[in-house]
């Protein structure tokens, strides 16, 4: 009797779990009724493209800073990972990164609208890597320099000069793959958020690496000062 009750309870739990997973998936993807969060987001992306991209980019940029600080164990002077850089990164994502991406990717899509040949797709990838990416990366590095405390043109220029080619090398590896995927599988109005997500992971990696190097250099300076 006890074994039978246990089996029935197990089946009931499995059924409830399956139903819950189904409902969560339906809410996320929209299911057949198109009422999920993804469907709602895509509708907002079509009806209010720039606003939706600004909110998406701002959220991802702020989250990127918090996540990179957590991975690198870079705590603020108050002992937590939410530093003054987080709201600055959020503002950068909303008012610089998103509008710039909206403009540049929009131009790229208009130039190649209706052109689906292999040659056109290759040209679009080349234009993205040789025109769009350099502009976005230069603006990104200038913004990061200012957020980090650069106040003179020389400081900003030095930051861009030092970081431009390393960032471009990462872009030249990831951008063709991301754009080829977008060309094949995604509607054009979802491209900018998709690239924002790709940029989120790349930016988190670069930001984490930079923080770790800075903390390591700081520890070396502190260790040297103690031995003197």
Swiss-Prot record:
The organism's superkingdom is given as: Eukaryota
Q: Any stretches that span the bilayer, and where are they?
A: 89-109, 130-150, 162-182, 185-205
| Pfam families associated with the record | Mpv17_PMP22
Give the subcellular location: Peroxisome membrane; Cell septum
- Please provide, in alphabetical order, the Gene Ontology terms of the cellular component aspect for this entry: cell septum; cytoplasm; peroxisomal membrane; Woronin body
Q: Print the keywords alphabetically.
A: Membrane, Peroxisome, Transmembrane, Transmembrane helix
Record bears the keyword Membrane: yes
Which residues belong to the signal peptide in this entry? none
Membrane topology classification: Multi-pass membrane protein
Q: Which family is annotated?
A: Belongs to the peroxisomal membrane protein PXMP2/4 family.
What does the function comment of this entry state? Answer: Woronin sorting complex protein involved in both Woronin bodies (WB) formation and inherence. Localizes to large peroxisome membranes where it self-assembles into detergent-resistant oligomers that envelop hex-1 assemblies, producing asymmetrical nascent WBs. These structures are then delivered to the cell cortex, which permits partitioning of the nascent WB and WB inheritance.
Instruction: Describe the subunit structure.
Output: Self-assembles into detergent-resistant oligomers and forms a complex with hexA assemblies.
Please identify the protein, giving its name as recorded: Woronin body membrane protein wscA
């Amino acid at each position: 009797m006890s074994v039978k009750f246990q089996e029935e309870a197990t089946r009931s739990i499995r059924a409830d779990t399956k139903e819950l997973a189904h409902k969560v998936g339906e809410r996320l993807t929209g299911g057949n009724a198109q009422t999920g969060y993804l469907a709602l987001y895509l509708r907002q992306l079509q009806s209010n493209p720039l606003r939706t991209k600004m909110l998406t980019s701002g959220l991802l940029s702020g989250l990127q800073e918090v996540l990179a600080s957590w991975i690198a164990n870079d705590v603020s002077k108050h002992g937590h990972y939410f530093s003054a850089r987080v709201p600055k990164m959020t503002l950068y994502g909303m008012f610089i990164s998103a509008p710039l991406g909206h403009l540049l990717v929009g131009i790229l899509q208009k130039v190649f609208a209706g052109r689906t040949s292999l040659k056109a797709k290759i040209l679009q990838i080349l234009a993205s890597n040789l025109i769009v990416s350099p502009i976005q990366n230069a603006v990104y590095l200038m913004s990061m320099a200012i957020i980090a405390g650069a106040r003179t043109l020389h400081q900003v220029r030095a930051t861009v000069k030092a970081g431009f080619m390393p960032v471009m090398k990462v872009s030249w590896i990831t951008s063709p793959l991301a754009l080829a995927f977008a060309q094949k599988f995604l509607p054009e109005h979802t491209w900018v958020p998709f690239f924002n997500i790709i940029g989120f992971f790349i930016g988190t990696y670069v930001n984490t690496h930079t923080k770790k190097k800075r903390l390591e250099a700081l520890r070396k300076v502190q260790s040297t000062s103690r031995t003197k």
